[in-house]
From Swiss-Prot:
Gene3D superfamilies: Winged helix-like DNA-binding domain superfamily/Winged helix DNA-binding domain (1.10.10.10). The modification Phosphoserine is found at S62. Residues 51-63 have a biased composition (Polar residues). The lineage of its organism: Eukaryota, Metazoa, Chordata, Craniata, Vertebrata. Recruits TFIIH to the initiation complex and stimulates the RNA polymerase II C-terminal domain kinase and DNA-dependent ATPase activities of TFIIH. Both TFIIH and TFIIE are required for promoter clearance by RNA polymerase. This is General transcription factor IIE subunit 2. Belongs to the TFIIE beta subunit family. InterPro entries: TFA2_Winged_2 (IPR040501), TFIIE-bsu (IPR016656), TFIIE_bsu_DNA-bd (IPR003166), WH-like_DNA-bd_sf (IPR036388), WH_DNA-bd_sf (IPR036390). One of its GO terms (biological process) is transcription initiation at RNA polymerase II promoter. Residues 67-147 bind DNA. The modification N-acetylmethionine is found at M1. The gene is Gtf2e2. The modification N6-acetyllysine is found at K75. GO terms for molecular function: DNA binding; RNA polymerase II general transcription initiation factor activity. Residues 17-64, 245-277 are annotated as: Disordered.
Length: 292
């Protein structure tokens, strides 16, 4: 080949190598997994917005028991509302019984289904310990049905005479209409004692028992110790004397769960045995004297 052509060829190669070249990157095709993940993300965002909308509706007070009309929670929610309403009206002094329709009207539950009404009439209200049935109507049933402050004072006096102690204030507030006025009107005829759990107990203040005791008798009383006796023995002694301990007014103690102790595993002791597998083969040569 002509040498001039070879020189031109080499020069062309050098110029081509020195010229910069920009390449376009290939756009990667989206895999089906990535597209499905994007769709899931969009669904989650949509669901989150709907959930936040429900939360805002609940906060605005638009949520009610009707949303749970097909569940058991709706039934028991209606029952709880009825019992609370009957208790409130009893505390106001409205102690006359009402029909089921009147109760549903006053609690704004006239739109409940026939199954719920039947359940309230035949099971829920009849078997509720706080509701009593009077001639086909329903009334609140407190632990102590008190009409006025005189009835309260007689009840406390009766408890004191029988050695039953006091009565919880919350039980009195439940059964006595306008209880705060009645308790305030009794004044020093009753006594208040607060329990460790901050619940108050009312006692009858027997003024006939207010007398001075000689100091010598007080010292003798304080000198008697019961440290050597447990509570069961003290309670048995009080019962023999006709005195009952006031257990109902005290705070209930939760019984502690006793854990079963795992029996200690007794490992069998192993003794070393030497050449036990050769017991029938070995011989004793201790009696043979070695030859000279």
């Amino acid at each position: 080949m002509d040498p001039s052509l070879l020189r031109d060829r080499e020069l062309f190669k050098k110029r081509a190598l020195s010229t910069p070249v920009v390449e376009k990157r290939a756009v990667p095709s989206e895999s089906p997994s990535s597209s499905s993940s994007k769709k899931k993300k969009a669904k989650v965002e949509h669901g989150g917005s709907s959930g936040s909308k429900q939360n805002s509706d609940h906060n605005n007070g638009s949520f009610n028991l009707k949303a749970l009309s097909g569940s058991s929670g709706y039934k028991f929610g209606v029952l709880a509302k009825i019992v609370n309403y009957m208790k409130t009206r009893h505390q106001r002094g409205d102690t006359h019984p009402l029909t089921l329709e009147e109760i549903l009207d006053e609690t704004q539950h006239l739109d409940i289904g026939l199954k719920q009404k039947q359940w309230l009439m035949t099971e829920a209200l009849v078997n509720n310990p706080k509701i009593e049935v009077v001639d086909g109507k329903y009334a609140f049933k407190p632990k102590y049905n008190l009409k006025d402050k005189k009835a309260l004072l007689r009840l406390l006096d009766n408890h004191d005479q029988r050695g039953l102690g006091g009565i919880l204030l919350e039980d009195i507030e439940e059964g006595l209409p306008n209880s705060q006025k009645a308790v305030k009107a009794l004044g020093d005829q009753i006594l208040f004692v607060s329990r460790p759990d901050k619940k108050k107990i009312l006692f009858f203040n027997d003024k006939s028992c207010q007398f001075s005791v000689d100091e010598e008798f007080q010292k003798l009383w304080r000198s008697v110790t019961v440290d050597s006796m447990d509570e069961e023995k003290i309670e048995e002694y009080l019962k023999r004397q006709g005195i009952s301990s006031m257990q109902e007014s005290g705070p209930k103690k939760v019984a502690s769960i006793q854990r079963r102790k795992k029996p200690a595993s007794q490992k069998k002791r192993r003794f070393k045995t030497h050449n036990e597998h050769l017991a029938g083969v070995l011989k004793d040569y201790s009696d043979i004297t070695p030859g000279k």
